[in-house]
Amino acid sequence: VAFQEFDNKYINYESELLHLTSDDNEPWVKSYDAWVCGSDQIWNPNYPTATRNAFLQFAPESRRIALSASIGISDVNTMLPEYSEWIGSIPYLSVREERAAEIITELTGKNAEVFLDPTMLISLEKWNQMADQAETKLPSKFAVGYFLGIREKKYDAYIQQEIKGLAYVDLLNGEATEYLKFG
């Protein structure tokens, strides 16, 4: 619910549908000045979302920009074979991790700028203001979970044992909207 409310308020969706499985660049795709990708773990080869679309392969090459993209691994040998071509086709590259910049150079011979996580572009005061506007307040003491990838059910009992009765907030649980409501 909170994600939908955020989308309705802040995201202006186009009426056109991008056919991500097609190699065709529809005319409207070419009408944009730039296509930007970048997110936490967007290029992690262990994630199912690390497809050609995460590397903007549907967009005209000259309009591709990677802004603070994250690979989230340190071993170049775990990269998918296509990564060299896909990353090499992005003319403007910035990544979050120093090691990611090194990997890009190893794979493509290109340099990538290291740029901070975009959430750090917001001041502490702004973050505090948004937290104060939250409709639901967090308990005074709680444990936070943030698991990359798929968390297996077998870890649930271990988590409950370790947090010793504290409230548990799973930041990647899209169904736990009570912690995602902001004014």
What residue ranges belong to the model's regions?
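A short beta-strand/loop micro-motif in the catalytic core of glycosyltransferases
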Residues: 91-97
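Catalytic donor nucleotide-activated moiety binding site of glycosyltransferases and closely related
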Residues: 69-72, 103-104, 147-183
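Conserved donor-binding/catalytic core segment of Leloir-type glycosyltransferases
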Residues: 136-150
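Helix-loop-beta element that forms the nucleotide-linked donor phosphate-binding surface
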Residues: 102-119
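Aromatic- and Gly/Pro-rich donor/ligand-binding loops
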Residues: 1-85, 132-133
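Alpha-helix capping/helix-boundary segments
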Residues: 42, 99-100
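A short helix/loop element that forms part of the nucleotide-sugar donor recognition site in Leloir-type
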Residues: 126-137
